[in-house]
UniProtKB/Swiss-Prot annotation:
<dbReference type="InterPro" id="IPR031717">
    <property type="entry name" value="ODO-1/KGD_C"/>
</dbReference>
<dbReference type="GO" id="GO:0006099">
    <property type="term" value="P:tricarboxylic acid cycle"/>
</dbReference>
<dbReference type="InterPro" id="IPR001017">
    <property type="entry name" value="DH_E1"/>
</dbReference>
<dbReference type="InterPro" id="IPR029061">
    <property type="entry name" value="THDP-binding"/>
</dbReference>
<dbReference type="InterPro" id="IPR023784">
    <property type="entry name" value="2oxoglutarate_DH_E1_bac"/>
</dbReference>
<comment type="function">
    <text>E1 component of the 2-oxoglutarate dehydrogenase (OGDH) complex which catalyzes the decarboxylation of 2-oxoglutarate, the first step in the conversion of 2-oxoglutarate to succinyl-CoA and CO(2).</text>
</comment>
<dbReference type="GO" id="GO:0030976">
    <property type="term" value="F:thiamine pyrophosphate binding"/>
</dbReference>
<dbReference type="Pfam" id="PF00676">
    <property type="entry name" value="E1_dh"/>
</dbReference>
<comment type="subunit">
    <text>Homodimer. Part of the 2-oxoglutarate dehydrogenase (OGDH) complex composed of E1 (2-oxoglutarate dehydrogenase), E2 (dihydrolipoamide succinyltransferase) and E3 (dihydrolipoamide dehydrogenase); the complex contains multiple copies of the three enzymatic components (E1, E2 and E3).</text>
</comment>
<dbReference type="GO" id="GO:0045252">
    <property type="term" value="C:oxoglutarate dehydrogenase complex"/>
</dbReference>
<dbReference type="Pfam" id="PF02779">
    <property type="entry name" value="Transket_pyr"/>
</dbReference>
<keyword id="KW-0560">Oxidoreductase</keyword>
<comment type="similarity">
    <text>Belongs to the alpha-ketoglutarate dehydrogenase family.</text>
</comment>
<dbReference type="InterPro" id="IPR011603">
    <property type="entry name" value="2oxoglutarate_DH_E1"/>
</dbReference>
<dbReference type="InterPro" id="IPR005475">
    <property type="entry name" value="Transketolase-like_Pyr-bd"/>
</dbReference>
<dbReference type="GO" id="GO:0006096">
    <property type="term" value="P:glycolytic process"/>
</dbReference>
<keyword id="KW-0786">Thiamine pyrophosphate</keyword>
Length: 955
């Protein structure tokens, strides 16, 4: 008997949950117990009861003409439909996915539903009634249940029910239910897999015995991580992927380096012995890092395909590498050689992130990075996440490290499919890897593999884990390795015999011994002890002429003030832009935002791409930039920098999510992988940048010294004390200055639009060279439109960036100057504004002011040459608006002492030490600021001093 044609049997198109709904509606129709869907009511009136027919089979699998009307089994049908969906949704709760535990058991929701249905009930229901795509050989609902339990409750378990897209969800279920993922491997691939596991285990055990007590953070217990990465990398290569980016912590890193990235064993052993070996490529900076933090780049290939694999350098700050590697991938995906936005091709590269089971739910950077995955400015076409799940974080059990059942549960909130797999089932692990790469390449979205194993030793090899997990480690001690388990399986299946397995083991051991024999004795020469900064770094950025011809600037400005005909610019913005029309003419003045746009355009015309991101970067936090215009009628956007002539480089400016750490990491990674690009991150206020402090500490400031990893990232950090309270005043320059050493970056606080123009162009000029380094700018807020920060066209068309500037009209009588005031940024402008105001009388002949535009590296020669002009100088004073324990004072003090020598005093004027960067009372702030200025200029003026704390001292 065959299924009726759907033209005469409309019920044939209803299956699964839809079928259950139809049957419920028919029951209501017959009993009159409730309202029925009008369309279904019409079908019931025409065709009668839902009727389902399937092939007739005999024996135990009998399934005959079946209708709720002639069987009275409506409730049973509904229960079967519900059971099928429960197996799909909750089968993972019964699966054997933890090698250290028995398969899940006990009365679960699933088991209760199964107990309510007898085998006879299930045999009476045709398979396709509840499973439309039931494969051949599946005839009854009983067959369906057996098959789905086999799929969903073994060593592979799936969580797909949270996926919102029905097409994706259907594809995932079809992939796992069709059994195409679990096709038997060829004997050749099985043998290769055993060899790989033997190499991984042999390598770890060799290190364990040869370098006793040395830290290596063994992978043992989750050995299948290496074959899983192999599978993803090579399947990606088959799909045409050119770059695979991997981010991971120290656990298992050495084995991944040795096997996935093909770092020679001999080079690994040399690092353990502290020996030099011929052919080893240095992949670290002058200070270096421990071996399990280092990365590597390698072209990986087999007989058919090849791809470049990059394992990112990584600190011990878990998961902070995640956004960095995402930035790598985006940079590799984009073509930046045309004007307009970069052209992205997500098939060119993808990311694999290896997480820890404690760190994945524990570190907030994970969630921040996951949130980037579908944002236009940051998406990379899908990341494959692998949780190397050994069920413990150092000494902390999982029940103390997360509030969820699985360590992967965070991913559900980001619509990411999840596969849990038993790390002791190698072929199941490869199936998970295969599903992950197929999904990523098809849907361009993230996928997560929860690789559940154990940790055979302690957190490191000097740690005894039995102290804190005695029962677990009794089990682990007696538990066979995955290599041994798989070897037994292959032997039982007749793929290999015992002698052949032993031959594989011996081959690996001989290779390890042979490579170890190549390693010379430890190098104890002075060269390995003394750290020397490379000359090109120590030399610093040399003076560079960065002016742009005036005619070019005028042409650029004209283009910046143009937009398509019919494009309706917001009236207020239009007025702001129109004020810039004559800025480059005689008597014109250039404000900060225009100087920036002119710098951007000129940099683009010289072939350097630009990427700028931040929480409000298109408009600018202070409504000053307006680099992306919005049509008031259509909300379409337009950026004049995309349409300027003579540009062969991309420009992108994006508003970022409310994240600092992930976005800073991403932009750093983008810049590392696209060194020719001017990459800038702008904080909404500099105060908020400290939520990315780990990125500044571990990557931006120290990446080159540790790993030889160059970056030209620009940080724009709005800074300045304006009475707006402790969260809107300070970018904490003291922290960047504390990290400043070995010419690792430039820290500047500028006082004019021209200076900003020139320093951006200087930074662009060193990109991709050995002279490159990050640029940390304390950018203005109130100074954005301040008259004293405006510049003339000639100041942009001529000259270069000046690390120090002298206050105009001061110091004209050198022999009378007694006090030299040094300051930076807004404080310097406040001093200049007070002088210009003419409110008070000063003995200006006795004062000279120098603005320190570049705090680090400090322009010592320039300042020293100024000091030498003043033969009667009595004191050098540092003036700042920040409290004494913040700002630049503690950085400047030893510099001033050295500059002053024995005969000249040094001093400080500013706020006293405080625990909070700024007060919250704007009136108190104003009074304090006036007092600081008064003392700095030595004004004989009666200020309200009774309740104000201003510190003035000299040595």
């Amino acid at each position: 008997m065959t299924r009726k044609n759907t033209t005469t049997n409309p019920w044939a198109k209803f299956h699964g949950p839809n079928l259950g709904y139809v049957i419920e509606q028919y029951d209501l129709y017959v009993t009159g117990a409730g309202s029925v869907d009008p369309e279904l009511q019409e079908l019931f009136e025409i065709f009668g009861a839902p009727s389902f027919q399937d092939d007739v089979v005999t024996g135990d699998n009998t399934a005959t003409h079946f209708s709720p009307q002639n069987t009275g089994n409506i409730e049973k049908i509904l229960k079967v439909v519900q059971l099928v969906e429960q197996i799909r949704s909750f089968g993972h709760t019964l699966a054997h996915i933890n090698p250290m535990e028995d398969a899940a058991n006990g009365q679960s929701l699933l088991e209760k539903a199964m107990n309510e249905l007898s085998d006879a009930d299930l045999k009476a229901i045709p398979a396709k009634t509840v499973w439309q795509d039931a494969p051949e050989g599946i005839h009854t609902a009983l067959d369906v249940i057996h098959r789905l339990k086999e799929v969903y409750t073994q060593t592979l378990a799936y969580e797909f029910s949270h996926i919102q897209d029905s097409e994706e969800r259907a594809w995932l279920h079809q992939m796992v239910e069709s059994n195409s993922l679990r096709q038997p491997l060829s004997n050749k691939k099985r043998t290769a897999l055993l060899k790989r596991l033997t190499a991984v285990e042999g390598f770890e055990q060799f290190l364990h015995k040869t370098f006793v007590g040395q830290k290596r953070f063994s992978i043992e217990g989750v050995d299948m991580l290496v074959p899983v990465l192999d599978e993803i990398v090579l399947e990606g290569a088959k799909n045409g992927v050119e770059d695979v980016m991997i981010g991971m912590a120290h656990r298992g890193r050495l084995s991944v380096l040795a096997h996935v990235l093909e770092k020679p064993y001999s080079h690994m052993f040399a690092e353990f012995k502290h020996a030099k070996i011929e052919g080893a490529v240095a992949n670290s900076g002058w200070t270096g890092d421990v071996k399990y933090h280092l990365g590597r780049e390698q072209v990986v290939s087999n007989e058919e395909v090849s791809t470049r694999v990059t394992l990112a350098n990584n600190p011990s700050h878990l998961e902070f590498v995640n956004p960095v590697v995402e930035g790598f991938a985006r940079a590799a995906q984009e073509n930046r050689k045309k004007s307009g936005l970069p052209e992205q091709d997500t098939s060119k590269s993808f990311v694999i992130l290896v997480h820890g089971d404690a760190a994945f739910p524990g570190q907030g950077i994970v969630s921040e990075t996951l949130n980037l995955s579908r944002l236009n400015a940051y998406q990379t076409g899908g990341t494959i996440h692998v949780i190397a799940n050994n069920a413990v974080g150092f000494t902390t059990d999982s029940y103390d490290s997360r509030s969820t059942k699985y360590s992967s549960d965070l991913a559900k909130g980001f619509d990411i499919p999840i596969v849990h797999v038993n790390a002791d089932d190698p072929e199941a692990c490869l199936a998970a890897a295969n599903l992950a790469i197929q999904y990523r390449m098809l849907f361009k979205k993230d996928f997560l593999i929860d690789l559940i194993g154990y940790r055979r030793y302690g957190h490191n090899e000097m740690d005894d884990p039995a102290v804190t997990q005695p029962q677990v480690y009794k089990k682990i001690k007696n538990h066979p390795t995955v290599r041994a388990i798989y070897a037994d399986q292959l032997q039982a299946a007749g793929v290999l015999n015992a002698d052949e397995i032993e031959t594989i083991t011996q081959f690996i051991q001989e290779q390890l011994k042979s490579d170890y024999a190549q390693v010379p004795p430890a190098d104890t020469s002075d060269a390995t002890i003394h750290v020397k900064v490379p000359d090109v770094v120590a030399k610093g950025i040399q003076p560079i002429d960065t002016g742009v011809e005036l005619d070019s600037l005028r042409a650029i400005n004209e283009g910046l003030l143009s937009w398509p005909e019919g494009f309706n610019v917001y009236p207020k913005v239009k007025k702001i832009l129109e004020r810039r029309k004559d800025a480059l003419e005689e008597n014109g003045k250039i404000e900060w935002a225009l100087a920036e746009s002119l710098a951007f355009a000129s940099i683009l015309q010289e072939g350097t791409p630009i990427r700028l991101t931040g929480q409000d970067s298109q408009r600018g936090t202070f409504a000053h930039r307006h680099i992306v215009l919005h049509d008031t009628d259509t909300n379409e956007t337009y950026s004049p920098l995309h349409r300027l002539p003579n540009i062969n480089a991309s420009f992108s400016v994006h508003n970022s999510p409310l994240s600092e750490a992930a976005v800073v990491g991403y932009e750093y990674g983008y810049n590392v992988f696209a060194p020719e690009t001017l990459v800038m991150w702008e904080a909404q206020y500099g105060d908020f940048s400290n939520t990315a402090q780990a990125l500044f500490d571990q990557y931006v400031s120290a990446g080159r010294a540790k790993w030889g990893q160059k970056s030209g990232l620009v940080l724009l950090l709005p800074h300045g004390y304006e009475g707006q309270g402790p969260e809107h005043s300070s970018a904490r320059p003291e922290r960047f200055l504390q990290l400043a050493a070995e010419n690792n970056w430039t820290v500047a606080n500028l006082t004019s639009a021209a200076q900003y123009f020139h320093i951006l162009r200087r930074q662009a000029s060193v990109l991709g060279t050995e002279a490159v380094r990050p640029l940390v700018l304390m950018t203005p807020k109130s100074l954005l439109r301040h008259p004293l920060t405006l510049s003339t066209a000639s100041q942009l068309s001529e000259g270069r960036f000046q690390p120090a500037l002298e206050q105009e009209n001061l110091g004209t009588k050198p022999n009378k100057v007694k006090r030299l005031v040094l300051s930076t940024g807004k404080m310097a402008i406040d001093l200049a504004a007070e002088i210009e105001s003419g409110k008070h009388e000063y003995n200006l002949d006795e004062i000279h002011i120098v603005r320190i535009e570049q705090l680090y590296p400090f322009p010592a020669e320039k300042v020293q040459s100024i000091i030498k002009r003043f033969k009667n100088l009595e004191e050098i004073i540092w003036v700042q608006e920040e409290p004494r324990n913040m700002g630049a004072w503690h950085y400047m003090a030893p510099i001033l002492f050295e500059l002053a020598g024995d005969k000249v005093k040094t001093g400080y004027i500013g706020r006293p030490d405080r625990s909070s960067p700024s007060g919250g009372d704007p009136f108190a702030h104003k009074a304090e600021q006036e007092l600081i200025v008064a003392h700095a200029l030595d004004v004989k003026y009666n200020f309200r001093q009774d309740k104000l704390e201003i510190e003035v001292f000299s040595n």
